[in-house]
UniProtKB/Swiss-Prot annotation:
It comes from Rhizobium leguminosarum bv. trifolii (strain WSM2304). GO terms for molecular function: 4 iron, 4 sulfur cluster binding; lipoate synthase activity; metal ion binding. CDD domains: Radical_SAM. The gene is lipA. It is found in: Cytoplasm. This is Lipoyl synthase. It is an enzyme of class 2 (transferase). Pathway: Protein modification; protein lipoylation via endogenous pathway; protein N(6)-(lipoyl)lysine from octanoyl-[acyl-carrier-protein]: step 2/2. Binds 2 [4Fe-4S] clusters per subunit. One cluster is coordinated with 3 cysteines and an exchangeable S-adenosyl-L-methionine. [4Fe-4S] cluster 1 binds at C61, C66, C72, S300. One of its GO terms (cellular component) is cytoplasm. The keyword RNA-binding does not apply. Keywords: 4Fe-4S, Cytoplasm, Iron, Iron-sulfur, Metal-binding, S-adenosyl-L-methionine, Transferase. Disulfide bonds: none annotated. SMART domains: Elp3 (SM00729). The lineage of its organism: Bacteria, Pseudomonadati, Pseudomonadota, Alphaproteobacteria, Hyphomicrobiales.
Length: 323
């Protein structure tokens, strides 16, 4: 089975995951009761969807098949995915389409900014596909989107979730210089899984990227997330936490991997809520300012509320250090 989807133009059918078509179908495990969600039907959801379509925007909520879309869109929260809906990578877990991307939409920064203002967002999350085809990996486009939002909605805090800018010298520095409030780059999984789960990326490059953000701007909040249920061992997750703390990462998110189609990496296990709580406790003991760990945790879920708590946690830490 190969999924076909186009959320903006339903008539433009295309193979979504051509690189996975040759793979044998894998069994999709039945979800336990603790990760069941209701279908989105609310008025708020419909209004958010209408704004997204009006401005011809792409959201990771739709493209990645996020289970929290109903809850977030009902509250007028959305994570905008810039630089198109086609990614140059082919991660085994991801539902975003793979292929040759289109040219950048030069009107996109202004369109995103208009949507942010229209939705009255106090906090916005901007992510993107990987654009290995671009000389700077899309750094300039990130910069333009941040600037446009600042101009249209100055009070809105901005969180970015970036690709790894692998082999793109100067790209990270350009994005950090644009001064987002939160810089998020997801590790996704433990290093032992990278060859099968995230083959186009390099674990220690991603760790170094997060570390470099703090070197460039020590005041910038950094954030990273992983999925569990991909066959990792507990000790591997704890080592990853240590690696992130070595890079001075402030905020860690941990959520359950959910298999998009039979062609994607299979779910090896459903991690229990108690185990997620245990990971949260350990992560706090290692020094993270904020930890979100639950089956339905995703990078942008409750991002606005979490940002307020993140700021409060830093202020508390600074006050305690001054005493």
């Amino acid at each position: 089975m190969v999924t076909i989807l186009d959320t903006i133009n339903p008539d433009a059918k295309r193979v979504r995951h051509p690189e996975k078509a040759h793979r044998p179908d894998t069994e999709v495990m039945r979800k336990p009761d603790w990760i069941r969600v209701k279908a989105p039907t609310s008025k708020g959801y419909a209004e958010t969807r209408a704004i997204v379509k009006e401005h011809k925007l792409v959201t990771v909520c739709e493209e990645a098949g996020c289970p929290n879309i109903g809850e977030c869109w009902d509250k007028k929260h959305a994570t905008f995915m810039i630089m198109g809906e086609i990614c140059t990578r082919a991660c085994a877990f991801c539902n975003v389409a793979t292929g040759k991307p289109n040219a950048l939409d030069m009107a996109e920064p202004e369109n995103v900014a208009k949507a942010v203002k229209e939705m009255g967002l106090s906090h916005v999350v901007i992510t993107s596909v990987d654009r290995d085809d671009l000389e700077d990996g899309g750094a300039e486009h990130f910069e333009k989107v941040i600037w446009a939002i600042r101009a249209a909605s100055p009070a809105t805090t901005i969180e970015i979730l970036t690709p790894d800018f692998l082999k793109k010298p100067g790209a990270l520095e350009r994005v950090v210089a644009a001064k987002p409030d939160v810089f998020n780059h997801n590790m996704e999984t433990v290093p032992g899984n990278y060859l099968t789960v995230r083959p186009g990326a390099r674990y220690f490059h991603s760790i170094r990227l997060l570390q470099r953000v703090k070197e460039l701007d020590p005041t910038m909040f950094t954030k990273s997330g992983i999925m569990v249920g991909l066959g990792e061992e507990r000790n591997e997750v704890l080592q990853l936490m240590d690696d992130l703390r070595t890079a001075d990462v402030d905020f860690l998110t941990i959520g359950q991997y959910l298999q998009p189609t039979r062609k994607h990496h299979k779910v090896e296990s459903f991690v229990t809520p108690d185990e997620f709580k245990s990971y949260e406790t350990v992560a706090y003991s290692k020094g993270f300012l904020m930890v979100a760990s639950s089956p339905l945790t995703r990078s942008s879920h409750h991002a606005g509320d979490d940002f307020a708590r993140l700021r409060a946690a830093r202020e508390k830490k600074l006050l305690m250090a001054a005493e």
